[in-house]
Amino acid sequence: MAATENTLILETTQGPVTIEMRPDLAPGHVARIKELVREGFYDGIVFHRVIDGFMAQTGCPQGTAMGGSGQKLKAEFNKEPHVRGTASMARAANPDSGDSQFFICFDDASFLNGQYTVWGKVTEGMENVDKIKRGEPVKDPDKIVKARMAADAA
């Protein structure tokens, strides 16, 4: 049960993406993302900022990169590296400004290490992340059709 409780499944327009969440690295972030998932917050939200060779960002209800859930999170920076498949929290200049937006790295992004909260890693479906349409902003963006915790699907 513990493994599925920390397994996030994103049904995207490009196919399913499974992220193993890491409460050992970022307990506050993982708990908040689970809350948002269970509230249906991420359902229908677009990948609004997608930079080739870098990352795909989602989690803004307006699709503008300016919105969120309204609940800021205290930074939980850790030593986990930003590499291909890393799931990390987006934020503004203030380290404690993470909210609902997160990104998945397409490739190594070590320049982010220790400055953004890593909270998980893609374990299945990275090929679907690779297919997400690029752009800033993205024209006709891909989206999260439905986000769910594996434990809730059982």
Describe the residue ranges of each PLM region.
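Cyclophilin-like peptidyl-prolyl cis-trans isomerases
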Residues: M1-A154
